[in-house]
């Protein structure tokens, strides 16, 4: 996979995460867009379209090292407080919210990932993205989260504006909040943390089993999975992309970085089970 050939865009707020574990508090860069960029930067030249007022200089430098950074002006920076109850369960609270993303760069891309954290991507931007790239992926989560500060709330929403996407990722628990049928998108990826997930290609169902990884935390897993799947799907068929994305995500969880070889990903992908379901 040649880095530098493809031009891709990731849209969404990067986030200042305040993480509480017991009495310890740490601050770090987060947000679905950040984790998707981390993965996608392994496949293509990435542009990041985001919005914030201020972030620590080293975080901005990290974003710039991953791709071309475009920051829309905002009075606020999106910030969450994550309180870990155990490695897979956390309580999430929205502290502040940056400005919405109301325009895309005026050019074409090979792929665009729309990964909002709390409703910062309007419906017309989704429609515009579909005209700007042949492969458009999105994560459902940020489209059904309330932008109101306080404990994170999911809102029921008619998500028919996502129709026509190449790839839509969602957590199995989130799907009931959105009216999305598997036939309305090319590929629908439903994950359930470390448990088996479901994927649909043109409405046909498959079951896939993520690789077991002992992890201290799972933050960013779904966003890395979406970023990696998008990267592979630019050049590989559906099932191969699914297996490789699952392997890529397992290695990310193990290392908490994407600094591993693609040979290792391809080797590990052979251990991922994907089976067609008859329903």
Predicted segments, located by residue:
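Conserved N-terminal subdomain of the carbohydrate kinase-like
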Residues: 7, 16-27, 42-120, 124-135, ...
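Short beta-strand scaffold segments in enzyme catalytic cores
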Residues: 38, 80-83, 196-200
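Conserved phosphate-binding/catalytic region of the ribokinase-like
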Residues: 154, 180-279
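Short, conserved phosphate/pyrophosphate- and ester-handling motifs at nucleotide-, phospho-/glycolipid
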Residues: 40, 171, 222
């Amino acid at each position: 996979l040649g880095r530098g050939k493809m031009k891709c865009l990731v849209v969404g707020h990067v986030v200042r995460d305040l993480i509480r574990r017991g009495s310890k508090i740490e601050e770090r860069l987060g947000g679905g867009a950040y984790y998707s960029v981390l993965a996608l930067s392994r496949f293509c030249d990435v542009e990041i379209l985001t919005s914030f007022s201020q972030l620590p200089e080293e975080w901005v430098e990290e974003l710039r090292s991953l791709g071309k950074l475009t920051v829309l002006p905002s009075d606020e920076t999106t910030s969450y407080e994550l309180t870990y109850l155990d490695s897979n369960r956390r309580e999430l609270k929205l502290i502040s919210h940056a400005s919405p993303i109301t325009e895309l760069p005026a050019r074409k891309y090979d792929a665009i990932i729309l990964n909002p954290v709390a409703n910062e991507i309007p419906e017309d931007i989704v429609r515009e993205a579909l005209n700007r790239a042949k492969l458009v992926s999105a994560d459902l989560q940020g489209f059904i989260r309330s932008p109101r500060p306080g404990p994170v709330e999911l809102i029921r929403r008619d998500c028919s504006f996502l129709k026509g996407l190449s790839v839509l990722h969602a957590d199995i628990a989130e799907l009931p909040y959105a009216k999305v049928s598997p036939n309305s998108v090319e590929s629908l990826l439903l994950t359930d943390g470390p448990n088996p997930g479901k994927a649909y290609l043109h409405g046909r169902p498959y079951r896939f089993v993520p690789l077991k990884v002992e992890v201290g935390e799972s933050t960013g897993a779904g966003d890395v999975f979406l970023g990696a799947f998008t990267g592979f799907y630019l050049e590989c068929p559906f099932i191969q992309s699914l297996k490789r994305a699952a392997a890529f995500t397992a290695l990310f969880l193990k290392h908490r970085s994407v600094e591993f070889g693609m040979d290792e990903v391809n080797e590990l992908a052979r251990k991922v089970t994907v089976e067609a379901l008859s329903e």
